[in-house]
Amino acid sequence: MAAPYPGSGGGSEVKCVGGRGASVPWDFLPGLMVKAPSGPCLQAQRKEKSRNAARSRRGKENLEFFELAKLLPLPGAISSQLDKASIVRLSVTYLRLRRFAALGAPPWGLRAAGPPAGLAPGRRGPAALVSEVFEQHLGGHILQSLDGFVFALNQEGKFLYISETVSIYLGLSQVEMTGSSVFDYIHPGDHSEVLEQLGLRTPTPGPPTPPSVSSSSSSSSSLADTPEIEASLTKVPPSSLVQERSFFVRMKSTLTKRGLHVKASGYKVIHVTGRLRAHALGLVALGHTLPPAPLAELPLHGHMIVFRLSLGLTILACESRVSDHMDLGPSELVGRSCYQFVHGQDATRIRQSHVDLLDKGQVMTGYYRWLQRAGGFVWLQSVATVAGSGKSPGEHHVLWVSHVLSQAEGGQTPLDAFQLPASVACEEASSPGPEPTEPEPPTEGKQAAPAENEAPQTQGKRIKVEPGPRETKGSEDSGDEDPSSHPATPRPEFTSVIRAGVLKQDPVRPWGLAPPGDPPPTLLHAGFLPPVVRGLCTPGTIRYGPAELGLVYPHLQRLGPGPALPEAFYPPLGLPYPGPAGTRLPRKGD
């Protein structure tokens, strides 16, 4: 029995009568038969009608989205599986890419004019057909030949395009990355660097903060906070239409092994090289993945040499076949710093690679010159990786894999004191006495004696100071010490020499030519001098301490990078004396 109608006083019944399958509610009151008001049946009809309208609208939208997806430059198997949000994102990105590419040099665009009208494909020559097919597949062939993936970023740091080869090197999807922000895929500690490389943020002045090497990959990834990307990014005024870019970033990867990288787990170090087009405010670059860290997975060829270095780039061990490519043996390399063999013009780039190595855990250096013992140099390129020790998890070292790119060049050009002929060293061995002698008391016309708190005189003889052409008159009254009175054991290895006439003769205490048993970390070799000054290096020279030259690098002996002196004391032109003529900066021990 049906429930009583609420307004019937509880004594009536509600029945549904009608024919032909229709159900009409009626209210039987005493002596009356009244039609009941609209009930659940009419509401159900309205809901059904609304659902049908929404279903029809969604069907039309899906049809339009399907047609839009077919216009995307993607394979049909991929475009048919996209959702609506992905279709809209890829469509907007493609339109932005077309606008970005139209500003290229030369501008890129679809072929406006096809074959001549009325000329059927069958009537075209074989050469025209081959050329057309080649142009259609040219992009794919180029991507397959590149050892990396290509991508383009707009002014906001979003991927306008990224090649499908990114799945080979990072294991990520091209469809998911296109239109997304690059900051969603790079390490939080590299956000500031990417902003600077894109020209969206002015590089902050001051020295870089020395990173700390942590054995825990999870804790190291949380050291750097994600920088805020302001809505109104300050764009640097373009100094040129095209600017070259080369930097290293850590990008997410699903192909990295657990515990492989000590700096960040789940990230790969990518070497990004490309061009920043300032007028279009975008970056077109190529990303290279660096070789794996384990030597078991690294194919070693005949032109490759493996070094094991400390975090300060001191050589701990090297392969014996290093003598096949250089005139230096393992005994002459072990215990020395790599900076003692690097050409002076390449020292700045090696230092930057050193900073990136300590910060990101892996780096590839540019082309640099490695000094030889007999003079000259060889060209090298190295891939360095911070690896942990199997015995001591907290200890780390550097695997330095160098590719020998050339034979020895400039064999008759000495660039450092250890490259000088052996006759100079024999001249130093006139007396076998190993004990150093104290200099004479200060007299008029001679150099002053060192103070009590000054560093002790190094073992070796005093080299005669060659006065400059304009100072011959003033130096006539000054006497020179007898070389035989200061005997020393000859060891002119890894010392820095410059002609004394280049610098003004002020009371500066010269260092001995022969260094102590272990060279101090602040020694400066002649490779750091500019070619003009380095070309003046001859046997009759004098060597000064690094503070007199204004070029020191004690930060290279620490675990992390850091400036030793302000930028004014590291002049880009390689000037050996930063202060005014006739003056020098005070140094501890003088």
Swiss-Prot record:
PROSITE patterns referenced in this protein's UniProt entry, alphabetically: BHLH, PAS
Ranges in coiled-coil conformation: none
Disordered, as annotated region: 198-229, 425-494
Domain bHLH: 45-98
Domain of life of the native organism: Eukaryota
Organism: Homo sapiens
Basic and acidic residues: bias regions: 463-476
Ranges of Pro residues composition bias in the record: 433-442
Keywords: DNA-binding, Nucleus, Repeat, Transcription, Transcription regulation
Keyword Metal-binding: no
Cross-referenced CDD domains: bHLH-PAS_NPAS1_PASD5, PAS
Protein name in the entry: Neuronal PAS domain-containing protein 1
Subunit structure and binding partners: Efficient DNA binding requires dimerization with another bHLH protein. Interacts with ARNT; forms a heterodimer that binds core DNA sequence 5'-[AG]CGTG-3' within the hypoxia response element (HRE) leading to a transcriptional repressor on its target gene TH.
Protein purpose: May control regulatory pathways relevant to schizophrenia and to psychotic illness. May play a role in late central nervous system development by modulating EPO expression in response to cellular oxygen level. Forms a heterodimer that binds core DNA sequence 5'-TACGTG-3' within the hypoxia response element (HRE) leading to transcriptional repression on its target gene TH.
Gene behind the chain: NPAS1
One GO BP: regulation of transcription by RNA polymerase II
Sequence ranges assigned to domain PAS in this UniProt record: 135-207, 293-359
Biased composition (Low complexity): 212-222
InterPro entries: bHLH_dom (IPR011598), HLH_DNA-bd_sf (IPR036638), PAS (IPR000014), PAS-like_dom_sf (IPR035965), PAS_fold (IPR013767), PAS_fold_3 (IPR013655)
Any Gene Ontology CC annotation: chromatin
Cellular compartment(s): Nucleus
Domain PAC: 365-408
GO MF term list: DNA-binding transcription factor activity; DNA-binding transcription factor activity, RNA polymerase II-specific; protein heterodimerization activity; RNA polymerase II transcription regulatory region sequence-specific DNA binding
